[in-house]
């Protein structure tokens, strides 16, 4: 089965000024596409050849895992963003965040602290644990909650290619801008699923 680059859920210029069209040209059009291309080169003739992307992520290791997980992580990241994003979550997700962190502002502070403190390349995730509570998880490189019992709700990509064009080496500024485009509707849908 050949894997393809999923379409973005928004136009490449729709996230400006928080994320530029140029960033999306490179991040989506080059980096994400390269993971798809590499995966398609790695799986022919293997046990992964006819598996879904999620099955490959859960069952693979090495280069196959790195590329398949990065395809999945990036697709999840694009869905974690919206030109109509920002604001704060509502309903059950807001209740879960407030129960864990005391307030949405305290959650944002903790999320930003974890994302800023992620050493090297990786991801910061808001996840739902099996007991129904939420947590903030940092993963390195291509690691993903998909291989755990936690359910991903929302993520931010903290690899340098995610922000270097717009923010240079200022990861905290990128994280601050992220709150303007965070897709809380997507996170709430994941929380309820």
Curated annotation (Swiss-Prot):
UniProt keyword list: Iron, Metal-binding, Oxidoreductase
- Cite the binding residues for Fe cation: 27, 74, 157, 161
Q: Key word Cell inner membrane present in the record?
A: no
- KW Repeat (keyword) present: no
The relationship between pH and activity is given as: Optimum pH is 7.5.
- Name the residues that span the membrane: none
Q: What is its EC number?
A: 1.15.1.1
Which SUPFAM superfamilies does the UniProt entry name for this protein?
Fe,Mn superoxide dismutase (SOD), C-terminal domain (SSF54719), Fe,Mn superoxide dismutase (SOD), N-terminal domain (SSF46609)
Q: What class of enzyme is it?
A: oxidoreductase
Tell me what reaction this enzyme catalyses.
Answer: 2 superoxide + 2 H(+) = H2O2 + O2
The record's free-text note on cofactor binding? Binds 1 Fe cation per subunit.
Cofactor dependence is on:
Fe cation
Q: Name one GO molecular function term.
A: superoxide dismutase activity
What is its biological role? Destroys superoxide anion radicals which are normally produced within the cells and which are toxic to biological systems. Involved in the metabolism of 4-aminophenol. May have an indirect role in hydroxyquinol metabolism by scavenging and detoxifying reactive species that promote its auto-oxidation.
Instruction: State the family named in the UniProt similarity comment for this chain.
Output: Belongs to the iron/manganese superoxide dismutase family.
What PANTHER family does the annotation carry?
A: SUPEROXIDE DISMUTASE, SUPEROXIDE DISMUTASE [FE] 2, CHLOROPLASTIC
Complex formation: Monomer.
> What is the official name of this protein in its record?
Superoxide dismutase [Fe]
């Amino acid at each position: 089965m050949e894997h393809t680059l999923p379409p973005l859920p928004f136009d490449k210029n729709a996230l400006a000024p928080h994320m530029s069209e140029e960033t999306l040209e490179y991040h989506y059009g080059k980096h994400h596409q390269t993971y798809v291309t590499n995966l398609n080169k790695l799986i022919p003739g293997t046990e992964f050849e006819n598996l879904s992307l999620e099955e490959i992520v859960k069952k693979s290791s090495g280069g196959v895992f790195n590329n398949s997980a990065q395809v999945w992580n990036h697709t999840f990241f694009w869905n974690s963003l919206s030109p109509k994003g920002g604001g704060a979550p509502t309903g059950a997700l807001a209740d879960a965040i407030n129960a864990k962190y005391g307030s949405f502002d305290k959650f944002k502070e903790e999320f930003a602290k974890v994302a800023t403190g992620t050493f090297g390349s990786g991801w910061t995730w808001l996840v739902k644990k099996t007991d129904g509570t939420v947590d903030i998880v940092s993963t390195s490189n291509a690691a993903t909650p998909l291989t755990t019992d936690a359910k991903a709700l929302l993520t931010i990509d903290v690899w340098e290619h995610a922000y270097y064009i717009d923010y240079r080496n200022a990861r905290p500024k990128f994280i601050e801008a992220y709150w303007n485009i965070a897709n809380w509707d997507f996170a709430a849908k994941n929380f309820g699923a």
